[in-house]
Amino acid sequence: ISKEKKKKEYLSKIYKESRISTKSRLTIIEVKRHLKDLENMIPSILSKMHESKGDVFRILGGRESIMFLIDHSKKEEILKLIPKDELIKTIENIGELIIHFSEKYGDMPGIVGPIINELGINNINIIQTMGGMPSFDIVINQKDISKCHDILLRLFYGER
């Protein structure tokens, strides 16, 4: 068996043992990457989040800006904590796909590429990706959640 085929079979095994979950009704709040302002902003935002209630809070860092991914229901409350001159934009109707890989495989190279490729081939606009083993999150438009989920079900489990 060729090396390529072995890797494909191994990836298939990893995908079959993975779980896919989704989250909808999210909002992105993008702010300027001014570390001094963020130093004050982040603790006050965190104080409004309740992990026990399942509140979503992710920080996505970039070179020029920082994005907060939050539940839409928290949007107004969080915006009050952000100085107007620090706010770049908000994006509503965001969805998230969370892929939970089996930890027994470690951090295998090439595990994410086929997923991104398959979504791209199927015309899915990926806003952001984040995470690392054992979890990989894909941020997309909420309207694409169902289509993405179906694509990943086919890729992972061969379901039609």
Task: Label the predicted regions.
Residues 1-160:
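A conserved regulatory-domain signal marking ACT and ACT-like small-molecule sensing domains
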